[in-house]
Every structure is written in C-alpha cells, then in structure tokens.
A protein has these predicted regions:
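Specific transmembrane helices
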Residues: 1-63, 68-88
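Membrane-embedded catalytic scaffold of the fatty acid hydroxylase/desaturase
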Residues: 36-48, 70-152
Length: 152
C-alpha cells in the first residue's frame, strides 16, 4: 500500500509539473515548508506504527472480526472498504467540529497552492489521529495480520 501511494503521488506530481491544469500562485517558501510537513508526517507515521507493533499489537487480544487467516488480498480489500467508509465520515466530522477544524484540519485547507503535495500538508495531531484510526480499523476491528503465512 505504501509503495502504491508513493508511486501514485510521484506520477501525480510529475504530471502537475509537465501538464499543469491551472497556474499556481508563487508562494515564497512554499516548497520548503511543504517538504518539511511531508518529512514530519513520514517520521510521525513511522514512529506511531513502530510503537503500535512494539507495544499494542503484542498485548492486543481483541479483534471484532478475525481476518488473520484470510488471504492478504482479502484483508487489504476489506480494510480498503472499511477505511474508505470510515475516513469519509471522519473527514466530514473534522469539517463540522469547530474544535477539530480549528486545532487540526484547517491547516490542511490553508495553502494557497492546491497540488498533490497539499495532501500531506497536515497538522501533526491530525496525522497522529488518522494513523491511530487506521491501525485500529486494520488490526483491532478487522483483526488483520502481518504474519507471512496469510500471504496465499
């Protein structure tokens, strides 16, 4: 999934540069600021995922559904369907909640340049909440497994 996201993002970024759909305003320092947010997001997500697998996963015995014996393609498909549904409503909720809007999500909508990199322009609290929600959906709700025996 991560590799797919990187490839899609890179292709979209190249297409934006080579075949722009609209002209973007010049914003001094935007590229550096956006790159810093992307780096921060990657470090934060990696840290949360490592902490999850070090501390939560070994002691977690609760799975609402147990997909660990299912094929990886089925786990990925079920996770995609569930997370797409949940994240749609979670996104709507961040727009409707004054607290979440002001403290996290407003930053994502603040840039004057709307482009692929803006996807990653998020407040660290929002990144942490999204990552924990995604991990919870995958491993607690669905009981997905990282065990290699479920590859078939």
């Amino acid at each position: 999934m991560f590799a797919t996201s990187v490839v899609v993002g890179a292709v979209a970024g190249v297409l934006e540069r080579t075949h722009p759909g609209t002209s973007l305003p010049h914003v001094p320092g935007w590229s550096r600021r956006a790159a810093c947010f992307v780096a921060l997001e990657l470090m934060l997500v990696a840290s949360i995922v490592m902490a999850w697998f070090a501390f939560v996963d070994p002691v977690s015995s609760f799975d609402l559904f147990d997909l660990s014996d299912e094929a990886v393609w089925f786990q990925v498909g079920a996770n995609w369907l569930l997370s797409t549904f949940v994240f749609y409503w979670w996104h709507r909720f961040r727009h409707d909640s004054d607290l979440l809007w002001r403290w996290t999500h407003q930053l994502h909508h603040s840039p004057r340049r709307i482009e692929t990199i803006t996807t990653f322009y998020k407040h660290p609290f929002e990144v942490a909440a999204d990552t924990l929600l995604n991990l919870s959906l995958s491993f607690i709700v669905l009981g997905a497994s990282t065990d290699r025996k479920s590859v078939v």
